[in-house]
């Protein structure tokens, strides 16, 4: 198994384009990134962005449009239209690309020096837990994207049915930040396995019907309950916020954190302000970790019980 980082200006351009078009109202939309990416836009560009936004929003599967744009598969008229009308904006994007290019090259080289030998058997166990064949653990490509200068940490995306990960690393490069980037890559890799799992869908649906539906709980703003379940499991596997997650021994060289380990810091957060949805989901995912670890190490398959500890926490903190 290998994960290879690469620089592809066209992929980065289409990621920038979909961000500045502001088509997405889900939790994946990041306003600070939108503001930074958009500072190069001129008033004359607005009709192009409006048209791009309309095309993406009108599609029954917007993320499939993005997947094909990033894969440079312009196999229908809407994809070809986006590529054609957006071409004049490449000059706008170029200043952002040039600003971060040197650091992205350093990140590419650092990521490609990572070893995944110790992670491969663990990922195979996760695949089995999800009801997948061990061969589901395959090579992947990481496309590096321009980060905003003030970003507090790396961020990634994994589009269903794709064989690549989109990654915005830290704006600046140093050795101390490598661990955080590696965790984000494995978090997104976990999403890729989860997206393939019918057992995950069945377990999540059963948990929803048992714990969410009877209480008529409304999903958090920008989320569907399916995306909440997806993030709970992916964070439980790999997360910067909760000390690494299930893969912590391989990613950080440290034991997996427990609820008792992390409770003081979460209590301090609660005393200061209301946690963000991302923090709540991370905290809730930590409550799943003991059961998830037992299931994976014992070769058991995912079921409804995996989610019960986390959903109770989500219910308490969102109610």
Protein language model features and the residues they cover:
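Auxiliary, metal-adjacent structural segments of Zn-dependent hydrolase domains
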Residues: 99-161
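Acidic, His- and aromatic-enriched active-site or binding-groove loops in soluble protein domains
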Residues: 158-177
